[in-house]
Swiss-Prot record:
The keyword Magnesium applies. GO terms for cellular component: cytosol. Belongs to the polyribonucleotide nucleotidyltransferase family. One of its GO terms (molecular function) is polyribonucleotide nucleotidyltransferase activity. This is Polyribonucleotide nucleotidyltransferase.
Length: 714
C-alpha cells in the first residue's frame, strides 16, 4: 500500500489529504486532517441507475466516534446511537454545497460517509469533513462539477479571522461558514452579533477568496490520485414529448399560475397534470418508452419556464405582488392563556404559533459533545406537521429539515437573548408551523421574538427574518422579497436573513447556479433590509417592548448570596436540609459553588419563606448577641439550646438562673423556648450561652412542662 498524500497550509492550520491506504473497495476514500482533527470520508457511487429512478439519490452521513476524543460513550449500551442534532446539522452542511454540482439528469445513487476519528478540541470537524467530502468526490470520477472549498470566518477586534480556533470563536462576533467553487459561492451558514449588511457580505467574499487554496490543492490531489472520469452523458431531451406536453398544458398552466390562492392553484395544476399524463399515456405507441416520471419532469420544467419568464419580463409574481413587496402581516400575542408567552405570526399563507417557556437552571440541556459536556440555556424547537401544507403524513421525531430550520431560527434570535446574569432563566421556544407557503423558518424567527417579548424576556431588540429569492437568465436577474414556496422551488437562490433594526443576526444562503456575483448578493441584502424593517415596524405596533413582568404561571427566580463555606449547612447531611426546604415550601433551589442561591417559586410568599430560612441557617452567631432558642436536650451539667441556623450552644447549670440550680429539669424542659445570650465562641466553634440577666425568672418546671405540652397539643 502506497498512500498518496497532499499537504498544504490553510490559514494558521496545516491540512493533510491522504488516499490509497484505507477503504480501497469504496469508489473513493480520503483521510482529511487539520492539525490533529481527522475525518475519514468515503464515497460510494453506483454505476447503474435504479429502474424508474426520477430524482438524484444523494445521501450524506456524518458520524462522530467518541474514541476520537479518547472517551467511552455513556449510557447502558456504551456505544454511539442515532445521530445527534449536531451531527445532523453537519451532514446538511456537507450536502448543501455539493448537491447543486451534479448535472441535471444524473440519477445514480451516491452515499457519502464522513466519520470523525480524531479530534483536536480547538478545531471543529465540520470544515474538515466538507473538505474531505469535496476531495473524495473529486477523486471518485463521478460527474461532479467541483471541487468545492470551505472556510469559517470569524470577526475579532474588527478584523476577519480565517478558520478561528474554538477559543478564538468565543471572542468572535461572527461564526460564518462559506463554501463554493473557484468561480462562485454556493452556500453560507452564519450567526452574527448584529453586524451590518456590508460586514456580512465582506465576510462571505473574504471566506470565498481564502478557500481558493483548498480548491487548488484538491485539483492537484485529483490530478495525482483521481480515478478516470465517468463517461456519463446527459440523456437527450425527448423533443417530441416536450412539444406534446407544451401543446396540452402551456396555456392552461399560464392561467393556473395567475390564481393567487395556493390550494386552489395546486388543485388546478394537479388537474392539468393528470390530464397531460392521461392523454399522453393513451397515445403511447407500442414499444415506446415513456414513463410517467418523464412526463412529470417535463411538466415541472414547463411550470418553471412560465413562472421564471414572467418574473424576468417584469410581470407580477404568482400572487400578484411586485418583486419587493412583503405579503400581508397579521400578529397576535398572548394567545395561549396558561403558557408563559405566546404569539401567532402570519405572513400571507405562512403561519407560525410560537410559544416561550421559562424554566430554572436545572432545565438546561446538557449536550454531550466530543470535546466534553456543555449546557445550553436557550432551546429552540421547530415543528413542521403535514397539515401545514394540507397533506397527511407521519408525525414523529424531527426530520433533518426540522432540525436545520430550528437551528437557523435559533441563530436569528440568539444574539438578542439576555445572559444568565441578566435573566436567570432557561428559555425554550417552540415554533409550530400551522400553515406554510414559503419561509416558515423566518416566520419562526418573528414569532419567537414576539413570544419572548410576551413572556417578559428582556431581549435586547426585536428580531425579524425574511427569505429572498433570485431568478437569473443570462445577464438578466431579478431579486424577490418574501418568496413563496413555488418561487423557492423554481428559483435559483434561497437567501434568508434575520436581524434587528441595526444589523444582521443570521444569514443562510443556498445557491443552485454558478454566477451569483457580489453585486447580486449586495442587492439581495439591501432588499432584505427594507423588508425586515417593514416587518419590524408591524411587530413593534403589536408589542413595542418586552412585558414588564413575567407570566403569573412562570416560576419567579429570587437570588441571594451566602458564604460558600455555609453551602454544606444549607444542603445538610445527605441533602436532608435542602430537601426539607423544597418539599415544605414547594420551591426549587439551586446553589452555585460561589454561594449564589437561586430560588424558583410560582408563589412569592414561598420564596420569601425559603430565603428567611436560608438566612437563618447561614446566620453567623455573634458573641454578646441575644437570641431566641429552643431547648433540645438536658444534661446534668446544663441544657443544650438550638439558636439561629440550628446551631446548638450550652447553657451551663450555673448560667440558668440567678439563684443556685440543683437540678436542670427543675427549670427547663425539652422543647421550651428561652432567651439566651452568647457568652463566648471558642476556637473549636463551641458556643457558651447564658440565661442570666436576659431571661425572666425561671418558673417551676411543672408549669413549664404544662406550657410545652399545651403548645404541642395546640
Amino acid at each position: 500500500m502506497n498512500p498518496i498524500v497532499k499537504q498544504f497550509k490553510y490559514g494558521q492550520h496545516t491540512v493533510t489529504l491522504e488516499t490509497g491506504a484505507i477503504a480501497r473497495q469504496a469508489t473513493a476514500a480520503v483521510m482529511a486532517s487539520m492539525d490533529d482533527t481527522t475525518v475519514f470520508v468515503t464515497v460510494v457511487a453506483k454505476k447503474d441507475v435504479k429502474e424508474g429512478q426520477d430524482f438524484f439519490p444523494l445521501t450524506v452521513n456524518y458520524q462522530e466516534r467518541t474514541y476520537a476524543a479518547g472517551r467511552i460513550p455513556g449510557g447502558f449500551f456504551k456505544r454511539e446511537g442515532r445521530p445527534s442534532e449536531g451531527e445532523t446539522l453537519i451532514a446538511r452542511l456537507i450536502d448543501r454545497p455539493i448537491r447543486p454540482l451534479f448535472p441535471e439528469g444524473f440519477y445514480n445513487e451516491i452515499q457519502i460517509v464522513a466519520t470523525v476519528v480524531s479530534v483536536n478540541p480547538q478545531i471543529c470537524p465540520d470544515l474538515v469533513a466538507m473538505i474531505g467530502a469535496s476531495a473524495a468526490l473529486s477523486l471518485s470520477g463521478v460527474p461532479f462539477n467541483g471541487p468545492i472549498g470551505a472556510a469559517r470566518v470569524g470577526f475579532i477586534d474588527d478584523q476577519f479571522v480565517l478558520n478561528p480556533t474554538m477559543n478564538e470563536q468565543k471572542q468572535s462576533r461572527l461564526d460564518l461558514v462559506v463554501a463554493g467553487t473557484d468561480k462562485a459561492v454556493l452556500m453560507v451558514e452564519s450567526e452574527a452579533d448584529v453586524l451590518t449588511e456590508e460586514q456580512m457580505l465582506a465576510a462571505v467574499v473574504f471566506g470565498h477568496q481564502q478557500q481558493q487554496v483548498v480548491i487548488d490543492a484538491i485539483k492537484e490531489f485529483t490530478a495525482e490520485a483521481g480515478k478516470p472520469r465517468w463517461d456519463w452523458v446527459a440523456p437527450e431531451p425527448n423533443t417530441a414529448l416536450i412539444e406534446k406536453v407544451k401543446a396540452i398544458a402551456e396555456a392552461r398552466l399560464g392561467e393556473a399560475y395567475r390564481i393567487t390562492e395556493k390550494q386552489a392553484r395546486y388543485e388546478q395544476i394537479d388537474a392539468i397534470k393528470a390530464d397531460v399524463i392521461a392523454q399522453i399515456t393513451a397515445e403511447v405507441a407500442e414499444g415506446e418508452d415513456i414513463s410517467e416520471g418523464k412526463i412529470v419532469d417535463i411538466f415541472t420544467a414547463l411550470e418553471s419556464q412560465i413562472v421564471r419568464s414572467r418574473i424576468i419580463a417584469g410581470e407580477p409574481r404568482i400572487d400578484g405582488r411586485t418583486v419587493d413587496t412583503v405579503r400581508a402581516l397579521d400578529i397576535c400575542t398572548g394567545v395561549l392563556p396558561r403558557t408563559h408567552g405566546s404569539a401567532i405570526f402570519t405572513r400571507g399563507e405562512t403561519q407560525a404559533l410560537a410559544v416561550a417557556t421559562l424554566g430554572t437552571e436545572r432545565d438546561a440541556q446538557i449536550i454531550d459533545e466530543l470535546t466534553g459536556e456543555r449546557s445550553d440555556h436557550f432551546l429552540f424547537h421547530y415543528n413542521f406537521p403535514p397539515y401545514s401544507v394540507g397533506e397527511t403524513g407521519m408525525i414523529g421525531s424531527p426530520k433533518r429539515r426540522e432540525i436545520g430550520h430550528g437551528r437557523l431560527a435559533k441563530r436569528g434570535v440568539a444574539a438578542v437573548m439576555p445572559t444568565l446574569a441578566e435573566f436567570p432563566y432557561v428559555v425554550r421556544v417552540v415554533s409550530e408551523i400551522t400553515e406554510s407557503n414559503g419561509s416558515s423558518s423566518m416566520a419562526s424567527v418573528c414569532g419567537a421574538s414576539l413570544a419572548l417579548m410576551d413572556a417578559g424576556v428582556p431581549i435586547k431588540a426585536a428580531v425579524a427574518g425574511i427569505a429572498m429569492g433570485l431568478v437569473k437568465e443570462d445577464e438578466k436577474f431579478v431579486v424577490l422579497s418574501d418568496i413563496l414556496g413555488d418561487e423557492d422551488h423554481l428559483g435559483d437562490m434561497d437567501f434568508k436573513v434575520a436581524g434587528t433594526r441595526t444589523g444582521v443576526t443570521a444569514l443562510q444562503m443556498d445557491i443552485k447556479i454558478e454566477g451569483i456575483t457580489a453585486e447580486i448578493m449586495q442587492i439581495a441584502l439591501n432588499q432584505a433590509k427594507s423588508a425586515r424593517l417593514h416587518i419590524l415596524g408591524v411587530m413593534e405596533q403589536a408589542i413595542p417592548a418586552p412585558r414588564a413582568d413575567i407570566s403569573d404561571f412562570a416560576p419567579r427566580i429570587y437570588t441571594m448570596k451566602i458564604d460558600p463555606k455555609k453551602i454544606k449547612d444549607v444542603i445538610g447531611k445527605g441533602g436532608a436540609t435542602i430537601r426539607a426546604l423544597t418539599e415544605e415550601t414547594g420551591t426549587s433551589i439551586d446553589i452555585d459553588d460561589d454561594g449564589t442561591v437561586k430560588i424558583a417559586a410560582v408563589d412569592g410568599n414561598s420564596a420569601k419563606e425559603v430565603m428567611a430560612r436560608i438566612e437563618d441557617i447561614t446566620a453567623e452567631v455573634e458573641a454578646g448577641a441575644v437570641y431566641k432558642g429552643k431547648v433540645t436536650r438536658l444534661a446534668d451539667f446544663g441544657a443544650f439550646v438550638s439558636i439561629v441556623g440550628n446551631k446548638e450552644g450550652l447553657v451551663h447549670i450555673s448560667q440558668i438562673a440567678e439563684e443556685r440550680v440543683e437540678k436542670v429539669s427543675d427549670y427547663l424542659a425539652v422543647g421550651q423556648e428561652v432567651t439566651v445570650k452568647v457568652v463566648e465562641i471558642d476556637r473549636q466553634g463551641r458556643i457558651r450561652l447564658t440565661m442570666k440577666e436576659v431571661a425572666p425568672k425561671q418558673e417551676h418546671v411543672d408549669s413549664v412542662v404544662a406550657d410545652v405540652a399545651a403548645e404541642e397539643n395546640a
